[in-house]
Amino acid sequence: MHIILMGPPGAGKGTQAVLLAGQEGIPHISTGDIFRAHMSQGTPLGKLAKEYVDAGKYVPDDVTNAMVRDRLAQPDCKKGFVLDGYPRTPEQARALDEMLAELGLALDAVINIDVPDELLVERAVGRRVCRSCGATYHVRFNPPREAGRCDRCGGELYQRSDDQEEKVAVRLNLYHSQTAPLLQFYKERGLVRTVRGDQPMDQVTADIKEAVRASR
């Protein structure tokens, strides 16, 4: 199965992508992981991407597309993959179509995890991270035993600047503006299956599994 997993920031997409890839016995391909691998290995593409990242600029599509194509061309992708974080725009989706056609592959499903914005904001704004060990808590859903202190090491818990409400709202607005045309692109081809991401994690996992089964 060749699958794209979509979902807004805070939807638990990364976790579900790893679980789905494990269930299917196929690789989980995250663009974040690809970027880090190329940059840490100092590949020509990695060096080019690093120049943009270090300058605080958006990495151009041709660089991102080339990195993704390099990964999809590896033998373990022949029988399937779970793409996480790509494509983000219809332009990238068209580039992906060309890559897959060249490689003799085709998409089977686009799974969209849908979560109300209010819940995504609540999840992010309530998140707290330990300064010492990096453990993550939530003031409502997973609070520490002692407020402001890590259960594991006693370190101070803090709110990341990215988790402030204004910044979360900006990320969500950007996601929606990019994703609406992308979803339409795939809906016109009958590939999109939407699951509710505002349920317990196990139920979301089960619904994704059913969506994949229905796409075979």
From Swiss-Prot:
<comment type="function">
    <text>Catalyzes the reversible transfer of the terminal phosphate group between ATP and AMP. Plays an important role in cellular energy homeostasis and in adenine nucleotide metabolism.</text>
</comment>
<dbReference type="GO" id="GO:0008270">
    <property type="term" value="F:zinc ion binding"/>
</dbReference>
<keyword id="KW-0418">Kinase</keyword>
<keyword id="KW-0862">Zinc</keyword>
<feature type="binding site">
    <location>
        <position position="31"/>
    </location>
    <ligand>
        <name>AMP</name>
    </ligand>
</feature>
<dbReference type="InterPro" id="IPR033690">
    <property type="entry name" value="Adenylat_kinase_CS"/>
</dbReference>
<feature type="binding site">
    <location>
        <position position="130"/>
    </location>
    <ligand>
        <name>Zn(2+)</name>
    </ligand>
</feature>
<dbReference type="Pfam" id="PF05191">
    <property type="entry name" value="ADK_lid"/>
</dbReference>
<dbReference type="GO" id="GO:0044209">
    <property type="term" value="P:AMP salvage"/>
</dbReference>
<feature type="binding site">
    <location>
        <begin position="85"/>
        <end position="88"/>
    </location>
    <ligand>
        <name>AMP</name>
    </ligand>
</feature>
<feature type="region of interest" description="LID">
    <location>
        <begin position="126"/>
        <end position="163"/>
    </location>
</feature>
<feature type="binding site">
    <location>
        <position position="150"/>
    </location>
    <ligand>
        <name>Zn(2+)</name>
    </ligand>
</feature>
<comment type="similarity">
    <text>Belongs to the adenylate kinase family.</text>
</comment>
<feature type="binding site">
    <location>
        <position position="171"/>
    </location>
    <ligand>
        <name>AMP</name>
    </ligand>
</feature>
<feature type="region of interest" description="NMP">
    <location>
        <begin position="30"/>
        <end position="59"/>
    </location>
</feature>
<feature type="binding site">
    <location>
        <position position="127"/>
    </location>
    <ligand>
        <name>ATP</name>
    </ligand>
</feature>
<keyword id="KW-0547">Nucleotide-binding</keyword>
<dbReference type="InterPro" id="IPR006259">
    <property type="entry name" value="Adenyl_kin_sub"/>
</dbReference>
<dbReference type="GO" id="GO:0004017">
    <property type="term" value="F:adenylate kinase activity"/>
</dbReference>
<feature type="binding site">
    <location>
        <position position="160"/>
    </location>
    <ligand>
        <name>AMP</name>
    </ligand>
</feature>
<dbReference type="GO" id="GO:0005524">
    <property type="term" value="F:ATP binding"/>
</dbReference>
<feature type="binding site">
    <location>
        <begin position="57"/>
        <end position="59"/>
    </location>
    <ligand>
        <name>AMP</name>
    </ligand>
</feature>
<dbReference type="InterPro" id="IPR007862">
    <property type="entry name" value="Adenylate_kinase_lid-dom"/>
</dbReference>
<feature type="binding site">
    <location>
        <position position="36"/>
    </location>
    <ligand>
        <name>AMP</name>
    </ligand>
</feature>
<keyword id="KW-0963">Cytoplasm</keyword>
<dbReference type="GO" id="GO:0005737">
    <property type="term" value="C:cytoplasm"/>
</dbReference>
<feature type="binding site">
    <location>
        <begin position="10"/>
        <end position="15"/>
    </location>
    <ligand>
        <name>ATP</name>
    </ligand>
</feature>
<protein>
    <recommendedName>
        <fullName>Adenylate kinase</fullName>
        <ecNumber>2.7.4.3</ecNumber>
    </recommendedName>
</protein>
<feature type="binding site">
    <location>
        <position position="199"/>
    </location>
    <ligand>
        <name>ATP</name>
    </ligand>
</feature>
<keyword id="KW-0545">Nucleotide biosynthesis</keyword>
<keyword id="KW-0067">ATP-binding</keyword>
<comment type="subunit">
    <text>Monomer.</text>
</comment>
<feature type="binding site">
    <location>
        <position position="133"/>
    </location>
    <ligand>
        <name>Zn(2+)</name>
    </ligand>
</feature>
<feature type="binding site">
    <location>
        <position position="92"/>
    </location>
    <ligand>
        <name>AMP</name>
    </ligand>
</feature>
<dbReference type="Pfam" id="PF00406">
    <property type="entry name" value="ADK"/>
</dbReference>
<dbReference type="InterPro" id="IPR000850">
    <property type="entry name" value="Adenylat/UMP-CMP_kin"/>
</dbReference>
<comment type="pathway">
    <text>Purine metabolism; AMP biosynthesis via salvage pathway; AMP from ADP: step 1/1.</text>
</comment>
<feature type="binding site">
    <location>
        <position position="153"/>
    </location>
    <ligand>
        <name>Zn(2+)</name>
    </ligand>
</feature>
<keyword id="KW-0808">Transferase</keyword>
<feature type="binding site">
    <location>
        <begin position="136"/>
        <end position="137"/>
    </location>
    <ligand>
        <name>ATP</name>
    </ligand>
</feature>
<keyword id="KW-0479">Metal-binding</keyword>
<dbReference type="InterPro" id="IPR027417">
    <property type="entry name" value="P-loop_NTPase"/>
</dbReference>
